[in-house]
């Protein structure tokens, strides 16, 4: 499993994104993506330019808006969310549904022109297996929590090869590492890349030290740049190792 994009190239796109993000229609996206994940999602989509995006998890709709900015030739977004009443932004390019990704027939979609975006706090494995079964190659996993945090099973937890935590409803439960899950990802993933944070503060979003226990790509900017990008600095804690996956 290898990286697809270089740190230097990712950083070159920050200034352009800052201008895009400054014009976002939803300024307070609490509970959803903010700049630490909006930027890498935008970057990946600009590079891949899919015709179709499956968006699993819509929330207020800011991600949907972002997809339109990154992919001007986008033909359709299939936006999935069981709670559409939270949506503030509605796209003319989106087809909205409540039916889960796993329960939808995707056979008519052009697999080579589709990217699947998971932002639904769900077990990643059945979803990755569904992508493999259907033939989808390009995936973004937004909720890619490390082994000691988070409310769902993620690629980062699996690839850590460590016992992992699921923190749900106020209860933290430790689960044993599953070697068969690691082997499945190792066998079926061509590219796996955790996208870098824009800023990396001393503490994680959970308030503990952001050290070697949280392996992380080098940040794109240092604290000395915080006055140049105040919004990025303000939202620096909203990072959970968003990743790009290309299946074999």
Task: Go through each PLM region and give its residues.
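A short alpha-helical cap/connector motif
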Residues: 1-116, 120-248
């Amino acid at each position: 499993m290898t990286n697809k994009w270089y740190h230097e190239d990712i950083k070159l796109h920050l200034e352009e994104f800052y201008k895009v993000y400054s014009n976002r229609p939803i300024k307070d996206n609490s509970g959803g993506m903010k700049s630490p994940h909006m930027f890498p999602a935008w970057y990946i989509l600009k590079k891949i330019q899919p015709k179709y995006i499956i968006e699993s998890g819509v929330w207020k709709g800011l991600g949907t808006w972002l997809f339109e900015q990154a992919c001007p030739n986008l033909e359709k977004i299939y936006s999935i969310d069981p709670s559409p009443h939270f949506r503030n932004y509605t796209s003319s390019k989106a087809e909205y549904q409540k039916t889960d990704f796993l329960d939808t027939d995707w056979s008519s979609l052009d697999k080579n022109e589709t990217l699947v975006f998971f932002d639904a706090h769900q077990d990643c494995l059945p979803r990755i297996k569904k992508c493999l079964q259907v033939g989808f190659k390009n995936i973004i996993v937004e909720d890619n929590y490390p082994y000691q945090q988070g409310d769902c099973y993620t690629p980062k937890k699996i690839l850590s090869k460590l016992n992992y935590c699921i923190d749900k409803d106020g209860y933290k439960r430790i689960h044993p590492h599953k070697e068969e899950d690691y082997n499945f990802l190792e066998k079926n993933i061509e590219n796996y890349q955790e996208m870098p944070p824009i800023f990396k503060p001393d503490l994680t979003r959970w308030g503990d030290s952001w050290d070697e226990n949280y392996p992380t790509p080098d940040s794109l900017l240092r604290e000395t740049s915080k006055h140049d990008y105040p919004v990025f600095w303000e939202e620096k804690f909203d990072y959970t190792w968003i990743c790009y996956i290309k299946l074999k």
